Amino acid sequence: MRYLKRITIYISLLILVSGCGNNKEAEIKQNFNKTLSMYPIKNLENFYDKEGFRDEEFDKDDKGTWIINSKMIVEPKGKDMEARGMVLHINRNTRTTKGDFIIKRITEDNKGIPDVKDKKYPVKMENNKIIPTKQIKDKKLKKEIENFKFFVQYGNFKNLKHYKDGEISYNPNVPSYSAKYQLSNNGYNVKQLRKRYDIPTNQAPKLLLKGTGDLKGSSVGYNHLEFTFVENKKENIYFTDSINFNPSRGD
């Protein structure tokens, strides 16, 4: 049931084939490093001046739109799964940013069929500040939204090249790829996540880098990272983050 729930959260499913060597791991790292080398970007307005990978999917005069997404998903033992996070569309053409803070709860009926209930709170960004665009009466929730920080604002992957012995998967038919690494609770990124979120486990996470599309670069597909603290039938705790550069869609 864990996988059904994750489909409803990601709205995508990767089909991976394991068994690749060090060369493929190096290619995957190189692909992700194009984005991860930008971390941290404390001022999100800097994205207005950042160029991303362009291909034939982009119109000639389209400067592109950055889509950033961070969320924490927690399913304690015996309780419902809840995801809380935010997505922003940073339009380089109009130099405007809008998005949503999203709370998603997933329950199961007596047959084990997941039921998804989500609530979206529209936001905009001005002067590097997140501003709700509709009235929010819940003061605690409003503060949570206004103070929200994306992982790209504090994460750091300068040591990515030193990550060793990853579990590598690659499927050239999709194409899709992934690399998984065991992390330590003493690592910088893990400490930053524990500082910002109430993570109800002392277990050190695994870092999963996964994506779809041409490893050499493509605007079709996506790259996505996940810190998995706990993953089993009764309990799931993980954090996800993504930054993708896409053609603008009339925003």
UniProtKB/Swiss-Prot annotation:
Pfam families the record matches: DUF576
Keyword Electron transport: no
Residues covalently joined to lipid (S-diacylglycerol cysteine): 20
Cellular component terms per the entry's GO annotation: plasma membrane
InterPro entries: Csa, Csa_sf
The keyword rRNA processing belongs to this UniProt entry's keyword annotation: no
Keywords linked to the UniProt accession: Cell membrane, Lipoprotein, Membrane, Palmitate, Signal
Lipidation positions, renumbered (N-palmitoyl cysteine): 20
Bilayer topology: Lipid-anchor
Cleavable signal peptide: 1-19
Annotated compartments: Cell membrane
UniProt superkingdom: Bacteria
Ranges annotated as spanning the membrane: none
Family, as annotated: Belongs to the staphylococcal tandem lipoprotein family.
Name of the featured protein: Uncharacterized lipoprotein SE_0144
Species of origin: Staphylococcus epidermidis (strain ATCC 12228 / FDA PCI 1200)
Lineage of origin: Bacteria, Bacillati, Bacillota, Bacilli, Bacillales
